[in-house]
Amino acid sequence: LESRNPADKTEIVATYPRSQVNDVDTAVASARKAYRSWRTVPAPARAEYIFRVGEILLQHKEELAQLISREMGKPLTEARGDVQEGIDCAFYSAGEGRRLFGQTTPSEMSNKFAMTVRMPIGVCALITPWNFPVAIPCWKAMPALVCGNTVILKPAEDTSACATKLIEIFQQAGLPPGVINLVHGVGEEAGKALVEHPNVDLVSFTGSSETGAFVGATCGRTHKRVCLEMGGKNAQIVMEDADLELALDGAVWGAFGTTGQRCTATSRLILHRDIKEKFTTMLYERTSKLRLGAGNDTDTDIGPIINEKQLQQVSKYLDIAREEGAKVLIGGEIASEGSLKNGYFFQPTILDRVTPDMRVAREEIFGPVVALIEVSSFEEAIAILNDSNYGLS
């Protein structure tokens, strides 16, 4: 597998093995063996390892942020925040090692004592996306490890270098062999093998709704515990009495932060008709000043799309928007001029005259595209906001 810089596709960041079923078998066997002893380590002692991970992450924060920016493309300010979330998660999870409380409950019988005790589940497969390559693996792995589980991380192939560096930091913290494992590969091979493996007890997945549906159905058939975080079509409502400057800040960051490549991105702006024209002008002016560029360029506001496939997906939705009758106020095209010629860049885009039934108002685009929908009342705005096929709001 090749990991390339999305701001300059000619640059190979790293190469990694394309793990197959036998590699997954090896990782699961390693995690299963380690689980037998790791689960007996007292929770406060397990938490000390995770606290050390947080300390090492703090020492390597800038190095990791630079790697995220180079491999995934997000601006350095965002990349530093990505690492900081991992650091915060480490220290929080470590604190929970002394708070894994159970419960005592009254018994109907005088010679009985009733209580609950938290017990680890077993081997956990963690399948993570590329948009938060440090934060999301940390969210998943750290609580699981403190609770006495062992884990296998299968990151998105676009951010293999970030995942490798993160696992090296876990190793530096002294975790016993087999407690945390890394499997590179594509979803249809390594990911599928993990989800279907009989010795995996829990699957935690963050990614597309289509893949998540497969993961959920498979875990249902095999009686695995499962946690799914999938797509969203999130909206921001701006009413006639809103603080428009405050709303504008939220709209620009929500729509174009991380190049719109977040399941929580603001892809719909629901605007009251009394302020729509004024707010649209404000949004246009702010959007026109946003600068495209490589993530490690300090002048960059919006980085590249992750890869060619996703770039073409965003472009396809702009064709759909035009066919459905939406008006492109700004952007709407692949950007390839000058220093952007070797990257996967898409212009920040505002779509006007969007109605709630259009595909661009209902389907996740995962790019720097925001759709404007006009309403005449708060009740209408709420109804449109809630009319979504996705679980995230």
Spans of model-derived segments:
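Glycine-rich loop-to-alpha-helix module at the N-terminal edge of alpha/beta enzyme cores
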Residues: 4, 8-100, 111
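Structural signal for hydrophobic packing residues in well-ordered secondary-structure cores
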Residues: 35, 39, 54-61, 65, ...
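Rossmann-like NAD(P) dinucleotide-binding subdomain of oxidoreductase/dehydrogenase enzymes
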Residues: 102-246, 375
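Terminal low-complexity tails and localization/encapsulation signals of metabolic enzymes
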Residues: 1-16, 48, 52, 84, ...
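ALDH superfamily catalytic-core signature
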Residues: 202, 210-355, 377-379, 383-384
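Residue-level signal for inorganic ion chemistry
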Residues: 10, 46, 68, 90, ...
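Short, well-ordered beta-strand elements within core beta-sheets of diverse protein domains
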Residues: 13-19, 33-40, 126, 236-239, ...
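Short acidic active-site motifs
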Residues: 23, 189-190, 380
